[in-house]
């Protein structure tokens, strides 16, 4: 079209005169040849223009198809990025912990992804409809402009054609000698010239109409091809049904089919991705099973092999194996808990006061738990410790009982001496001194009572010290009274009855003191028993921590050995770092915590690009929320549990994934009861 407009401008702007003065005298045959030559020249020009126009349209179509393809790739990349962002946001959202199976969780995730895909497709459809409307308006404007240009060319076409025809005449036609009958020739030539001009005008109009009809389907075809680039077969099928009145309906159908194809493709990709994740998860779980159990399971599978039903048999055996493992783990945990309860109750019954016991048991436990590889079972070690502790506590209890018997005999002897002294007091005659002694004894008893109440609040050493001081002071007072009574006894022989009756007060005072001593001893025993139980609990917790530390150390050594075997050397670690795949600088470690206390799992992960971290518990993913909180600081990632329960104990896993690879680290959380 640009070539036509340029030629039209050149012809209109040219000031070349048309040679009308010289008209050669030709015969009829020469006029016919001239007309045929002009016709051929016109057809060649039209063919050349049509070829140029087709070539230009073909190049434009190729450019548009390439541009649409690139634009489609960019849109798909953006859509995939949006899908990844949306999926990561959905994982970060707080979702309560589901108690269903893994299949149910995958179904829920599939529903969420389908909903997001549906929303995205609706937005894309709206955007494409708007874009198509804009393109339609643009094409209509271009068609209107082109129609105006064609009309302009038609208006100026007759003049240009006549000029070109005259030029061709000047170039191709050679004049010959004219006939002498000039009158006839002039008349015939004018008639022929009129007929020729009329034919040229009619033919030019027909040519213009044909060219316009040729351009209309080509424009429509270019539009349809630019809009529908995904499926060439469908586009060819739709070209047959294209008509001016049904263009919009056909485009909508094609758009709907394209959206459906995209939706199906996205669903297939999501389904494949879910299947790959399931397979990876199942493979990770199978790798964590012990080798012995795997050998047994494989033997069972081979025994249960049936030709033609391999898949069904394997699934049945796998289900049975999982149920057996779960039942064995529950029985083992129940048996271990019962043994620990029995051992703790037995140790609690046989526990006796031992101030030096924490240090002694600490040294003993340290002697038993020497660093290195442990060759003994921890349950057997715990049983041996409990037996030795039981035997030692029995010996100490016997020794303490003998010591208490000796102290009781000594106290009874002292009480007997005091009773004899009280009988000697009954023989006294000095009533006033006895009354004074009685008063002083009651006052002393009150003072002793207040002192014993204060002493009860002191420590055990201070209590023993105070008792010894009080006994020494009482012995001194008793000796002084004995000396006075002995002197008075030698002076007088008569004995009054009333003073003897009054002397019962010191005896009753001594009896009350004995009861007081018994109460004090009982209170002291109860307090010591309570302290013993606390020390026993602390000692058992300390031993449990040491056992857990030994277990953890053993596992760390095994992991280091496995890591050295798998990784080989630091050079391989450097190669892994350069590759960009995620790997754990600081893996998870086994942890034990008291019930209802918080716990934190910490790892250090590196990778390029930055890996995506997820936490798992017993094969189920943990969502970020109030119960399980995700914490991220640079390369350090934490899982924080603000409160723990007995059912939180088990295996935790941290999984890091990026486009270069994946890595995982596991640990065992042990929940200890408060009692």
From Swiss-Prot:
Residues 1-66, 105-127, 254-278, 313-336, 487-513, 551-584 are annotated as: Disordered. The modification Phosphoserine is found at residues 80, 241, 357, 365, 564, 569. The modification Phosphothreonine is found at residue 370. It is found in: Cytoplasm, Cytoskeleton; Cell junction, Adherens junction; Cytoplasm, Myofibril, Sarcomere, Z line. The lineage of its organism: Eukaryota, Metazoa, Chordata, Craniata, Vertebrata. GO terms for biological process: axon guidance; dendrite self-avoidance; homophilic cell adhesion via plasma membrane adhesion molecules; regulation of cell migration; regulation of cytoskeleton organization. Changing residue 652 to C: In CMD1CC; affects cardiac Z line integrity; no effect on protein expression and stability. Residues 582-670 form the Ig-like domain. One of its GO terms (molecular function) is actin filament binding. Keywords: Actin-binding, Cardiomyopathy, Cell junction, Cytoplasm, Cytoskeleton, Disease variant, Immunoglobulin domain, Phosphoprotein. The gene is NEXN. Involved in regulating cell migration through association with the actin cytoskeleton. Has an essential role in the maintenance of Z line and sarcomere integrity. GO terms for cellular component: actin cytoskeleton; adherens junction; axon; focal adhesion; plasma membrane; Z disc. This is Nexilin. Residues 27-66 have a biased composition (Basic and acidic residues).
